[in-house]
Amino acid sequence: MQENVKAPKRSKKAEQRAETIEQILDAAEYLFSKHGLYGVTLKDVAKKVGVHHTLLNYYFEDKNKLFHAVFARRAVVTSERRMNALDQYEKACGDRPTVEGALRAFLDTDLDLYIEGGEAWKNYAALGAQVANTPEWGAELMDTHFDPVVLRLIDLLKKALPDCSEEDIFWGYQFVTGALMLTLARTGRIDKLSHGLCKSDDFVAVKERMASFMAAGFLQICGQGR
């Protein structure tokens, strides 16, 4: 009979270190989401956390590595969740995926994080929108963290639209991600244009509409909505 082996407890010092790193990442995420990579210094982050800036150099070496760590922390979560959702959707629908079904697995799963995850996830959403719209250095980060899940979506869309050209499917995805990034940026523009009828941080309203709207666009450009 096997005895239950308990995992060794982390030392208090290790716990404090992990907690400090999380505080640094949270503070950096907030500041980067508001001011961008070039509008924030390590001293700014250190001041918000209440530590000396040399501690940030010790843990992350420089600002770029801190930024990459901030971005990667939640990128892993959203990428894995969407990949699992796409896998589960394909398993459930067999050989008959629909455009809207694939888009809901991809988009709704991501939007749920911003609906349920509080302000921290909304900060990450704004940060992601910045990264996606900064080709000089953001494209590489997006490629590294999100290409696998995006290509998984593309694969399902090809199965849902077997007569659609690859060109139209990739353009369709371009329009999807453009709308998603603008939504994640929460610029407040729709608030002003609609005189308060719509709120840019109302991710529930976005979730109710985005996948079906984008699915109709795919069907149209692929000749099935004409």
Give names to the regions the model predicted.
Residues 17, 21-29:
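Short, leucine-enriched amphipathic alpha-helices that occur as contiguous helical runs
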Residues 66-87:
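Histidine- and aromatic-rich ligand-binding microenvironments
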Residues 25, 79, 100-107, 173, ...:
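Short, amphipathic alpha-helical "lid/cap" segments that border enzyme active or binding sites
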Residues 1-7, 116, 147-226:
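C-terminal peripheral helix-coil segments that are non-catalytic and often amphipathic
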Residues 101, 105, 116-144, 187-192:
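Amphipathic alpha-helical segments used for helix-helix packing
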Residues 23, 31-73:
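Helix-turn-helix
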Residues 83-122, 173:
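Hydrophobic alpha-helical connector segments
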Residues 106, 110, 125-132, 176, ...:
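Short alpha-helical scaffolding segments that buttress acidic/His motifs in well-ordered protein cores
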